[in-house]
Amino acid sequence: MVRVGIDVGNTAIKVVTQASTAVEAAQPARTRGPQLRSISLRDPEWITKCIEHLQTLAEKVAACESRECESVCYDVRVASVNRGSAEPLVFALDEAFFQCIRVRFVTHEDVSMPIDVNFPERVGIDRLLGAEAAFRRHAAPLIVVDAGTTVTVDFVSAEGVFRGGAILPGLEMQTAALAAGTDALPKLDWASHRCREMPEGPGRDTVAAMRLGVLASVAGAVERLLRIYGGAATLVVTGGDAGCLVDALPAECDAVEEPHLVAQALLDLMLHE
């Protein structure tokens, strides 16, 4: 049996896998434990690459367990904020591994953490899973920031209760809006190292000015929300832009970078079922 967690976001999917104990024992120490693969949804072959990734894992499992590759079974949990991408992926997985696969979407009802908001079923499952995974790993109270397409800043009480939070546009969404809403401003590539560096002073060209403005807006919003939520809390930052945001925050925020909390939460969920 292979446990698979798939975090379907708006710009990428993260696939985390955990093989059986016997398979783990047969692997080199450096490759043991959960394996994570991130695939961009902009890649037209993203579904194919996801299936190929699982097939490669099946070959390793089959070799360790002396069985046919086709008989390797998968237990899959999907957390999605993007149904338009998640549904065709699940259909393709069922077709590729129909003999031995179980796929289930994760909902707020799967989260053991109490959810103290007006409409729990409307909260993004990524926010809930990230908050629960952070609570399992760090001292509460917690402020959990997920820096992706959007940036969410959520509060978990000392008792481990999800209290809600704030949502704002992410780095790429902000710069895309600047480029789309003006004639002269370019679209930035936040994946490049240069874009991810926080300028040390006023921007001396257009790109530097955009970088400074967007990074300062997100980092400044997080700092402001820390004050609004009040009290001392552990700050945990996850998501694709976690590293960039942590670098932009002042040292006194003492932010902890955990880039793959949602994927880790999916494995936690399966292990505790």
Curated annotation (Swiss-Prot):
Positions binding substrate in this chain are: F119, G124, I125, D126, R127, T206
The alphabetized list of GO BP terms reads:
coenzyme A biosynthetic process
Q: Where does ATP bind?
A: D7, V8, G9, N10, T11, A12, I13, K14, T149
Q: What is its EC number?
A: 2.7.1.33
* Recorded catalytic activity of this chain's protein: (R)-pantothenate + ATP = (R)-4'-phosphopantothenate + ADP + H(+)
Q: According to its UniProt record, which residues of this chain constitute the active site?
A: D126 (proton acceptor)
Where does the record say this protein resides? Cytoplasm
Annotated K(+) binding sites: D146
Q: GO molecular function of the protein, one example? A: metal ion binding
- Where this protein primarily resides, as one coarse class? cytoplasm
Q: In which pathway does it act?
A: Cofactor biosynthesis; coenzyme A biosynthesis; CoA from (R)-pantothenate: step 1/5
A single GO cellular-component term from the record reads: cytoplasm
What CDD domains is this protein classified in?
ASKHA_NBD_PanK-III
| Record-linked PANTHER family | TYPE III PANTOTHENATE KINASE (PTHR34265:SF1)
Q: Assembly and interactions?
A: Homodimer.
Q: What does this protein do?
A: Catalyzes the phosphorylation of pantothenate (Pan), the first step in CoA biosynthesis.
Annotated protein name in UniProt: Type III pantothenate kinase
- Give the encoding gene's name: coaX
